[in-house]
Amino acid sequence: MGQKVHPNGMRLGIIKKWNSVWFANTKDFADHLDSDYKVRQFLMKTLEKASISRIIIERPAKSIRVTIYTARPGIVIGKKGEDVEKLRISIAKITGVPVQINISEVRKPELDAKLVSDSITSQLERRVMFRRAMKRSVQNAMRQGAKGIKVEVSGRLGGAEIARREWYREGRVPLHTLRANIDYSISEAHTTYGVIGVKVWIFKGEILGGMETVERLDKPSIQTKKQYRKNRK
């Protein structure tokens, strides 16, 4: 039986960038990896309502730089940057090194697989019909300019006795084409009937030229708390 490879892992180094950007020798590697995991777990739990898309961690010269991609930067930054400062202190305690936090806004959350899957899971937990939640997400993504989107849910759908899987797709989602810019994410909805898994694939178009093109196009709008306040005025 054919199995599907992880779309993001398959494209790493071709058109996708890593979420942890650092190099460590054998002695330090495990510690760095463990602290990265703890930082991500802490941020996802603390900023649960901030619509976090992804977290990039870099380690320049005995320090750590965390870039948070979010659809709601105001919640992360807080009043006069107070929340960012609290986060910085907490992460410094976890990692034991100086921390710099940057915030990057996700302009189109409808085209971000992580945010779409989280949106569907939150709807399922609020007892919205799964077909309605799927269809709404697909229509919103296509309206915002996606070339294609596929959403799959699996589990005890609608409280059925036997778990099953259903999916809905619009446009094209070429999983075998390595230059295809496909965003993929998975989330879990914890309902009274059990856990329902949600998978989302979003095809945004093809990237020609590999990582060089990605570096050029994907320069994030990284903002410190001062820059963010300045831009809002």
Swiss-Prot record:
This is Small ribosomal subunit protein uS3. One of its GO terms (molecular function) is mRNA binding. Keywords: Ribonucleoprotein, Ribosomal protein, RNA-binding, rRNA-binding. Pfam families: KH_2 (PF07650), Ribosomal_S3_C (PF00189). CDD domains: KH-II_30S_S3. The keyword Cell inner membrane does not apply. Residues 39-107 form the KH type-2 domain. Belongs to the universal ribosomal protein uS3 family. The gene is rpsC. Binds the lower part of the 30S subunit head. Binds mRNA in the 70S ribosome, positioning it for translation. GO terms for cellular component: cytosolic small ribosomal subunit. GO terms for biological process: translation.
